[in-house]
């Protein structure tokens, strides 16, 4: 499992990742700037000679091994069942990204798999043995948004990916 950061494309020296590389990330989560008090603590520590990178790296400790993570994934897969109506729901949501006029490049099958696995993990974290439509819906944007490319017209109109994601899952009938 790899965690990575991506600088905004607007920054000098940064370039957008190709679609095939973006598709390999499970989630895209946007993190905002720190609160004022947190930033002041950071500045105070830095002013006092503390190098934040060194402090952070020294304090990092693994919480689980790669083997344990693999076992946890297997356990989740065995404990959380996936009903056919949830499979259909996920497939229909992802397919909508491929057939929307605002989309230049839609999400592929890897996105469907990612949405299924993330939904399964959400159910397990909620101590349920089944996936709910709300599990799926809550993960649509973090799982799909970075895999979808807006059409130039949609970008010029100022359509936000979050609005597109909401529109897409609202078009799909929720299973009962």
Regions found by a protein language model. Name each.
Residues 1-64, 69-79, 120-122:
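Canonical AAA+ ATPase core
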Residues 36-38, 50-55, 82-88, 97-103:
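Short, structured loop/turn "capping" segments at alpha-beta junctions
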């Amino acid at each position: 499992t790899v965690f990575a950061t991506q600088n905004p494309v607007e920054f000098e020296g940064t370039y957008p990742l190709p679609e095939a590389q973006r598709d390999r990330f499970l989630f895209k989560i946007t993190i905002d700037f720190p609160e004022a008090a947190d930033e002041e603590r950071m500045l105070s520590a830095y002013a006092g000679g503390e190098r934040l990178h060194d402090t952070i790296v020294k304090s990092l400790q693994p919480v689980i091994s790669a083997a344990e993570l693999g076992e946890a994934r297997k356990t989740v897969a065995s404990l959380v069942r996936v009903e056919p109506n949830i499979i259909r729901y996920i497939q229909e949501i992802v397919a909508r990204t491929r057939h929307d006029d605002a989309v230049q490049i839609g999400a592929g099958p890897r996105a469907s798999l990612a949405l299924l696995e993330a939904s399964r993990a959400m159910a397990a974290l909620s101590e349920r043995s089944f996936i709910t439509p709300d599990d799926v819906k809550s993960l649509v944007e973090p799982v799909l948004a970075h895999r979808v490319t807006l059409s130039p017209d949609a970008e010029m109109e100022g359509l936000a990916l979050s609005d597109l994601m909401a529109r897409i899952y609202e078009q799909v009938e929720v299973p009962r």
